[in-house]
Amino acid sequence: MKSTIIGNAHDLNAAQEIWFIQNILFSGSEINIGYSPNILRDQTVIYLELNEISGELIKQLRLEKNKIVLYHMGDEFGRMSREQYRNCDLVIRNYYFDEIFSSKEDVEVIWAPCGFKTGIGPRESVYIKPASKRQWRSSFFGWLENSASYNGEREGFARIAPECGEDLFLQATSGFAMGWNIGLYSIAMESSVFAPCPAGNAPETIRLYDALELGCIPISLSHDFIISPNALGLIGPAPFPILNSWNELPTFLKSIKEKVSSSPRELDDMQARCIAWWTDYKIAIQRKIAQRIQTL
């Protein structure tokens, strides 16, 4: 059965990861701006929603004998209403909350990664710059003064960052998405071996996927979405470094420097493991979603 993604112009424009959504998560499905009942009939409709889920739209889609897959984005705090979930055939959403994915909803809910920003990728792994030839040991470009960040991670990261010295290139911004343009940001990330990924409003950040796509090794604290087999743990443990606290970052970066001095290939090997894992993961999540949609 044919699948078509639909969303209003505002949401499609605001979804920074739209290429990833269309081509990785939903296997290249067509996208329609808005709802066209004369076109969308007797097929699988993937309804992308960033804000309030429209029960009226779901009803209209049902009248045309469509199967409805809700792709629910943007619920960073897990507080949005899920009342309309039961009126869909399948729900796919990002931002992992165990109470949502382990609860007995009236419909199956599958987690999907946010993915990388459009323009970051897709990157062919054979053309990714080796870690050993990158300019900076690590870098962070983004908003540090986010008082709403999960468990105060941005504040904790900002406090310890100066202790990293020359091992961390830091470019702080004054707000969300107020930094360098996507081209310069990509170049800078591709010039960095590691990318610390402190949580934003939610533990899951787009930065982590930007880093993976660019062959930049993420550094994170431990979070459910990284560990759970229903999320990034789908194909086994993530191969990138997981710290207990951002206070460990200066020591970690220093230890890497010492390790590389005695084992020059260490960085390239770690990078290769991350690239291979991310490549396999994209295939696995695409297959999981496609197979589930085919059974509707």
Where are each of the predicted segments found?
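A charged, aromatic-enriched C-terminal amphipathic alpha-helix characteristic of glycosyltransferases
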Residues: 254-296
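Catalytic phosphate/metal-binding cores of nucleic-acid and nucleotide-processing enzymes, i.e., regions
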Residues: 186, 246-249, 274
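Nucleotide-sugar donor-binding catalytic core of glycosyltransferases
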Residues: 1-236, 242, 277-293
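Short coil/turn linker and secondary-structure boundary residues
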Residues: 180, 244-247, 262
